[in-house]
A protein has these predicted regions:
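C-terminal membrane-solvent junction of multi-pass transporters and transport-like membrane proteins
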Residues: 87-90, 338-349, 380-440
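Membrane-embedded translocation segments of transport machinery
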Residues: 2-6, 167, 171-319, 323, ...
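Inter-helical loop and helix-membrane interface segments of multi-pass membrane transporters/permeases
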Residues: 3-4, 32-36, 66, 71-90, ...
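Membrane-interface "cap" regions at the ends of multi-pass membrane proteins
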Residues: 1-27, 56-61, 65-78, 82-89, ...
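Membrane-water interface regions at transmembrane-helix termini and the short interhelical loops
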Residues: 32-36, 83-99, 134-136, 149-173, ...
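Select transmembrane alpha-helical segments in multipass membrane proteins
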Residues: 5-16, 41-44, 83-96, 145-150, ...
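Juxtamembrane transmembrane-helix boundary signature
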Residues: 9, 14-17, 44-80, 103, ...
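Transmembrane helix-boundary motif of multi-pass solute transporters/channels
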Residues: 11-48, 234-240, 251-254, 258-259, ...
Length: 454
C-alpha cells in the first residue's frame, strides 16, 4: 500500500492523543487521584509522565518516523537482517488482542449512550441500575450488535484513507470530546456541594497518602503514567511514520501527554463534584461508569440530557482509541500481504469481529471459561496486553533505541531531535540507557506479581 502522510501537525497530535485517551482516563485516573492523596498524587504522576512516559513515547515516534513503516516492518528498516523483527509481529498481536476486548467495552459505551438518551434509566433506583448493567452483560445478542457497529463503522472510516478517513474523523471527534468534557466539568462544578468533591479530588492530602502507603502511591503514579499512553505495541509508532521531519519529537510527545492529562484531570472534575453532591461513593472501573454515574444522573435536574452527553463523551474516548489501533492493524497486515487498503480493512474487520465475540460470551454463555489465573475472558485478554505486552514491548523499544545491540543512541537522538522544537539533551544518555529500562522492568515485574498474587 502507498504510505500516506497526515495533512497537518494538529491531526498528528490529536490522533496520537486520541490513541492515548481512553476509558482508563475516566474510570481509573480520577479514582486513583482521590484515593492516593489528591493533588500530591497528581504531582508525582506528572513527574513520572515526564521521566518515563515522554521518553518512551518519543522513542516510538522516532522509530516510526525513521522507518516510514508499520511496527511490523520498522525493525527490518532500522536494523536489517537482525532478529529484532520478531517483535514487530508481537506488536501486531498486541494490537489485535487489545481490540478483542476494547471493541466490546466501546460497544458498552455506545449502548449506554443510546439507553440514556432514550430514557431507559429514568426513575430506576440504585439496585435497578445495577440490575440493568448485569442484564446488559447477560445479553450476548445486543452486545454483539453494538460491538459490530463499532467494528464495521471503524473499518469503514479507516478504509477511506489516512487523511480522508482517519485524520478527518478523529480531528472532529477529538475536538467534540474536548468541548463535551469542558461543558460537563463546568456543569458539575456548579452543583450544590460540588466544591467538597473538588477539594477531596485536588487538594493535597498527605494523610491519605500515608494510609495507602507512600510506596503504593509512587507505584500507582508510575504505573498510571506508563499505561495511559498505550506504549509498547507500536500504537504510537504508526503515527510517527505518517509525519515529516519539520518538528522534533520530544516536544510533540509533551503535547500529546499534556492533552491526555488534561482529559484525565477534567474527568475527575466531572465525577467528584457530581458524586459528592449526591453523597455517592466514587468507585473505579466499570462500577463507576455503569452503576454509580447513572444513579447520579437520575438525581440531577435534566439528568437524561447530562447523562447522554457524558456517555457520548465516553463513546468518543473509546472510539478514538479503536480507530487508532485499527489503523495500526491494517497498516501491519497491508505491508505483510500487499493487499489493497479496502481489501485489508474488509478481512481485518471480519477477523476482529469474530475474535471479539469470546469477550462478550465470557459474561454469559462462557461464564465458566476462565483462561488465565481464574479470570474471565476480558480480564485475561487485558492481562496479556496491560501486564505483559505493553511493558515488555516498551522495554524492548528502550533497549533498541539506546544500545549498540539495536538501532543505537546516536541514530535515535539524531531522529528525535531533527526539526524545530524541544530537543533531547545528550547528557540524558546514561539515564535513558541504564535507569529508564530498570523503571520499565520494575513495572513489568510488579504487574505480573500483582496479577497472580491477587
Amino acid at each position: 500500500m502507498h504510505r500516506e502522510h497526515l495533512a497537518s501537525r494538529l491531526g498528528f497530535i490529536l490522533l496520537s492523543a486520541g490513541c492515548a485517551i481512553g476509558i482508563g482516563n475516566v474510570w481509573k485516573f480520577p479514582w486513583m487521584t482521590g484515593q492516593y492523596g489528591g493533588g500530591a498524587f497528581v504531582v508525582i504522576y506528572l513527574i513520572f509522565l515526564l521521566i518515563l512516559g515522554v521518553p518512551v513515547l518519543t522513542m516510538e515516534f522516532a522509530m516510526g518516523r525513521a522507518a516510514q513503516k508499520s511496527p511490523l516492518k520498522m525493525y527490518q528498516a532500522l536494523k536489517p537482517g537482525s532478529r529484532w523483527g520478531w517483535h514487530g509481529y508481537i506488536c501486531l498481536l498486541g494490537n489485535v488482542v487489545l481490540m478483542m476486548f476494547y471493541t466490546t467495552v466501546a460497544g458498552w459505551m455506545l449502548q449506554y449512550f443510546v439507553d440514556t438518551a432514550a430514557g431507559r434509566f429514568a426513575g430506576l433506583d440504585v439496585s435497578a441500575v445495577e440490575v440493568a448493567f448485569g442484564s446488559m452483560l447477560a445479553n450476548p445478542g445486543r452486545q454483539t450488535v453494538y460491538m459490530g457497529l463499532i467494528v464495521v463503522s471503524g473499518f469503514l472510516i479507516i478504509s477511506a484513507g489516512v487523511q480522508k478517513g482517519l485524520e478527518r474523523v478523529t480531528k472532529w471527534m477529538m475536538l467534540a470530546l474536548i468541548v463535551l468534557m469542558l461543558v460537563l466539568a463546568v456543569h458539575s462544578l456548579f452543583l450544590p456541594g460540588g466544591s467538597e468533591g473538588l477539594k477531596f479530588y485536588l487538594l493535597p492530602d498527605i494523610r491519605r497518602m500515608e494510609d495507602v502507603g507512600i510506596g503504593n502511591v509512587i507505584a500507582g503514579a508510575m504505573n498510571q503514567s506508563f499505561f495511559t499512553l498505550s506504549l509498547g505495541i507500536g500504537a504510537m509508532a504508526i503515527f510517527g511514520s505518517y509525519i515529516g521531519k519539520e518538528r522534533s519529537l520530544a516536544g510533540e510527545s509533551v503535547r500529546v501527554c499534556a492533552l491526555d492529562t488534561l482529559v484525565a484531570l477534567c474527568s475527575g472534575l466531572i465525577i467528584f463534584p457530581a458524586c459528592f453532591s449526591y453523597g455517592v461513593d466514587v468507585k473505579s472501573g466499570p462500577a463507576l461508569i455503569f452503576m454509580t454515574l447513572p444513579n447520579v444522573f437520575n438525581n440531577l435536574p435534566m439528568g437524561r440530557f447530562w447523562g447522554s452527553l457524558f456517555f457520548l463523551f465516553m463513546t468518543f474516548a473509546a472510539y478514538s482509541t479503536v480507530l487508532a489501533v485499527f489503523e495500526n492493524i491494517i497498516s501491519c497486515v497491508g505491508e505483510l500481504t500487499l493487499w489493497s487498503r479496502k481489501k485489508t480493512c474488509l478481512i481485518c474487520g471480519i477477523a476482529i469481529f469474530l475474535l471479539s465475540v469470546p469477550c462478550i460470551l465470557g459474561y454469559n454463555l462462557w461464564s465458566s471459561f476462565r483462561p488465565i489465573a481464574g479470570r474471565d475472558v476480558l480480564d485475561s485478554e487485558d492481562f496479556l496486553v496491560s501486564n505483559l505486552l505493553l511493558p515488555g514491548g516498551s522495554l524492548l523499544f528502550v533497549i533498541f533505541c539506546t544500545t549498540r545491540y539495536g538501532w543505537g543512541w546516536e541514530k535515535f537522538l539524531a531522529e528525535a531531535n531533527e526539526g524545530k522544537g524541544l530537543k533531547i539533551a545528550r547528557w540524558l544518555r546514561p539515564y535513558m540507557t541504564f535507569v529508564l529500562p530498570v523503571i520499565v522492568g520494575i513495572i513489568l515485574v510488579l504487574g505480573l506479581y500483582n496479577f497472580f498474587a491477587s
